[in-house]
Amino acid sequence: MNDAKMTINRREMLLGGASLLALGGAAAYTKAMRAKPTVRETGPAISAFLPERDLAGLGHPMTAYAKIGGVELSRLILGGNMIGGWAHCRDMSFYDRLVKAYFTDERVFRNFRIAEACGVNTILTNPALMRVINRYWREEGGKIKFISDCGYKGGVIKGAIASVENGASMVYCHGGHADKAAVVKKDWKFFREYLDESRKLGVPVGIGCHSLATVKFCVEHDCLPDFWMKTVHRVDYPTAHLGEDRWKLQPTGLGVYDNRFVDTPPQEVFDYMATRPEPWIAFKVLGAGIEHPREAFPVAYKGGADFICCGMYDYQVVEDVNVVNDIFANGLPARPRPWHG
């Protein structure tokens, strides 16, 4: 397929109605969530597809960085859920297959190259992506760092070992495993073993979760990680359906509905995380596309998040980096929770 046809095909696929509901970064925002007519994005969003315009509109690369356990990270981290096929697109079951078909190795490389050019120096994803990350390092000369969620067929400890062996700079316990252990099984020994064994690998070790109860459980049992990977997003969008089942876990540890991982009001999350001195990487900040980064990022950072992990297609990276640069234009914004990292 020639470049012109490829550009058109990509444009048509990504600007369809389903994409507007699911895209993880800037183009994900749909004005339907504000009870207004949906507007098809044009202009800069489309021109970003053109190879010669990859970095068009970038004010400057990121300047906001901080360290967790000696590892320097950009305050904005590239999320890998979409690349791995975990798209979180409400009830549209086809979408996982769609993003898997879209994200060939070459498109993953393109995403990484643009992220690095914009100053985003870290990808956070699953061990399933180790192959393509290592290929990118080897064949493209990329330097992007890798944080692993350790979700692995042999368990999270084996996932941590495999991840570090394949170049991970940091690891954390996948939120699904952590929520199941804390909220469903009340198994504090799970966390103690994970932390003890993973720390033998010599990298920072975190705990991920969707439920605030998981953080509280770990603190109560003195299972303290080097960092938290905790969700936060608005819960007043029209499809939230808040009610008695707003936060119920199935035996698997997953929520009753897709994208219903964190229906805890954001302020409640911010208030509790303000009591924790460990660095906090916030994720699902856009709620799988219910909010634009211009609205969601400032709330998350000023509410207490030290870093944001956000899934971004190649054409979304520039806009998202510009948003973060604006937030940190005059240094660290004032907020109730001290900055960590």
For every predicted segment, state its role.
Residues 2-21:
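N-terminal secretory signal peptides and thylakoid transit peptides that target proteins
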Residues 28-74:
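C-terminal segment of N-terminal export signals and the immediately downstream linker at the start
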Residues 78, 205, 280:
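Conserved, mostly hydrophobic/aromatic
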Residues 129-136, 156, 179-193, 267, ...:
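Active-site-adjacent beta->alpha loops and helix N-cap segments on the catalytic face
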Residues 133-141, 160-167, 222, 274, ...:
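Acidic (Asp/Glu)-rich catalytic clusters
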Residues 177, 232-234, 303-317:
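Glycine-rich phosphate-binding active-site loops on the catalytic face of alpha/beta enzymes
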Residues 208-297:
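Catalytic alpha/beta core domains of metabolic enzymes, predominantly
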Residues 317-337:
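C-terminal helical cap(s) of enzyme catalytic domains, especially alpha/beta-barrels
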